[in-house]
């Protein structure tokens, strides 16, 4: 009770019993990205189904956890797929939506995809905000594709971020992020 910290777990697809154990141990949020739209999902994942993701999110809510779920843009999907992903997250009443922008990495199946433009990322952020007006729209991987660490994205609709390095790419400097967000009038 000394610190006001929300514990968020990210353990993949789990059972209702596991969700209950996580909640009982102090976890208040569960992270389960849907990755993309239902239509595009088979193109990016073959180990489980889109419905597996949806059922996990519904079960997390059922046991009283809030949910963090978003996806990755720039994996060959259409803008319509992005709209469908945003609508699905709104339908599921997801409280926190991380938006990752793909940075094509040599040696991966996505290495030859075009890099997203800043304008494309900003339009996507604005659309997610419009469809999910009360959710945290959380900038995640790919902020380095935008000028000024993605500052414009915070005026386009993002109101949260993940800072520091990501799984496969370098991220933004924490101190620089804090200074930028404070200068923009956000509380940290």
Say what each PLM segment does.
Residues 1-57, 67-70, 95-98:
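Core AdoMet radical
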Residues 10-14, 35-37, 70-76, 100-104, ...:
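Active-site beta-loop-alpha junctions enriched in small/polar residues
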Residues 19, 54-57, 86, 121-125, ...:
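Generic structural signal for well-ordered alpha-helices
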Residues 45-52, 77-84, 112-120:
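Alpha-helix N-cap and loop-to-helix initiation/capping positions
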Residues 68-71, 80-102:
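Oxyanion-binding "anion nests"
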Residues 1, 23, 57-62, 125-130, ...:
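Surface-exposed amphipathic alpha-helices with a cationic face
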Residues 14-24, 75-90, 144-156:
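Catalytic cores of alpha/beta
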Residues 90-188:
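Auxiliary Fe-S-binding modules of radical SAM enzymes
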């Amino acid at each position: 009770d000394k610190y006001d910290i929300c514990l968020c777990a990210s353990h993949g697809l789990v059972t209702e019993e596991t969700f209950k154990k996580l909640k009982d141990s102090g976890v208040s949020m569960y992270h389960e990205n849907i990755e993309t739209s239902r239509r595009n999902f088979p193109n990016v994942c073959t180990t489980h189904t889109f419905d597996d993701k949806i059922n996990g999110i519904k079960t997390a809510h059922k046991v009283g956890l809030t949910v963090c779920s978003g996806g990755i843009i720039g994996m060959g999907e259409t803008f319509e797929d992005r709209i469908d992903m945003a609508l699905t997250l709104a339908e599921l009443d997801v409280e926190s939506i991380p938006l990752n922008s793909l940075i094509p990495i040599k040696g991966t199946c996505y290495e030859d995809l075009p890099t997203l433009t800043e304008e494309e990322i900003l339009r996507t952020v604005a659309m997610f905000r419009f469809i999910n007006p009360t959710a945290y729209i959380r900038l995640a991987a790919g902020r380095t594709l935008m000028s000024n660490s993605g500052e414009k994205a915070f005026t386009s609709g993002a109101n949260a971020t993940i800072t520091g390095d990501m799984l496969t790419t370098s991220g933004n400097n924490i101190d620089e992020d804090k200074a930028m967000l404070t200068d923009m009038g956000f509380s940290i």
